[in-house]
Amino acid sequence: MERESNAAVDVTAGADTPGESPERRRAEVGDVDRSMYDFVKPESGYERFADGLSGDVVEEISRKKDEPDWMLQMRLRALETYERMEMPKNWGPAIGGLDMSTISTYVASGAKQAESWDDVPDDIKDTFERLGIPEAERTSLAGVGAQYDSEIVYHNMKDEVAKSGVVYTTVEDAMHSGYEDMIREHFGTLIPMTDHKFAALHYAVWSGGSFVYVPAGVKLDFPLQSYFRLNAAGAGQFEHTLIIVEPGADLHFIEGCSAPKYNVANLHAGAVELFVGKGARLRYSTIENWSKNMYNLNTKRVRVEEDGKVEWVSGSFGSHVSYLYPSSLLVGPRASCEFTGITFAGATQNLDTGCKVTLAAPDTRASVDTKSLSKGGGISTFRSSVVVTKKADRARASVSCSSLMLDDISRSDTIPAMDVRNATASVGHEATIGRISDDTILYLMSRGCSEQEARTMVVNGFADPVSKELPLEYAVEMNNLIKLEMEGAIG
């Protein structure tokens, strides 16, 4: 059942409490240097394909990667599918400003993939140092991949992780190092090229991304992370992430994204395919900080087997337009899904996000908890889709969406959809839409906060359930992004 309210919302949750550990004190946000994300590196000497899409472009990408014929044929079928399919109609924000004839589908620095930051070209290394990736690798990660425009420029994994049998590399490298059959078995099976027009585009020109294989019973103590940086103006990024977590294994994978702002359109149309085996667990965390000229048309999907569990943690910031609906297919008995997410739509932004869960086996469970914020005329739309099949006896699903508008010119919508075909299932939906309580702001100002500080504190409290699900350094980044979005929120 849906409940909508326009009443003022008091959302001061998240303030420090006595005895709370330092790792959980995240309400305070440090100053943000905008140059951390908006700096631009020159493309001198880079290889850049001509704008637009053609069979020659697709074949050249495949040739550069020395792909097997089956992958080339898949690309060519995808191109035909893309040309045949129409643009989305009557769905989400308008994307008429995206003209593929002005987008380059492949840009590469020419740098060889390195296993040491010392071997990465200085200009590219400086980019990732400013984003904090090498430091995060040293302190809290089991492995890191870094993509710059269309190609991975750095990839490394700790020796002890590799010795456990974990494979963490690019899809391209995996195809040439004994995993071609595994990739062919899984690649493009969860997200077919016919899913939508931009899925077809992705399969035609995909480049880069990550391949992760975790053997049965292996549990990683630290996360793996891939970071995707789109530096080139008027370009697209089309990475493909393929993760296979075998029965009884455990993995936390983190995905980070950013790009500088240009006065021309950029496009991100990646794909994420995740396979969670019997009794396995996968947490997939994402902080997306695309620039506000970006069209973010990403597709993510997971298949979860018996007693398996997937946990999505998603923070969506930036981009001009976003279509993002991670989908979970619970196909084994007692498979479960948890989705925790937040979006922040500021001026000129229209973020259409949400998630879909299909419960297709007995005793499956799904929990969705999302937060959305909008200010400065930004539009935030949350779509949820819960499907319960006839076989899903005693399935349980709950969806909760809380929206907070920070002014009178912004907009927030909640669009739930439920398809329940089993009488023993229980499905619930709750939505709240509101504004910051004036009384809350006045109280915080009476305690010494400025109005700007008070509003930022309230918003951080609102976002705290998502922040708590992230590793400390990524929670700090998310809170910094919130403060960056909050600058100028008064007046």
Features from the language model and the residues they span:
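Conserved beta-strand/loop scaffold segments within soluble protein domains that form the structured core
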Residues: Y154, E160-C449, A463-G491
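Short, low-to-moderate order helix/coil transition modules at the start of elongated helical scaffolds
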Residues: E2-A271, F275-R281
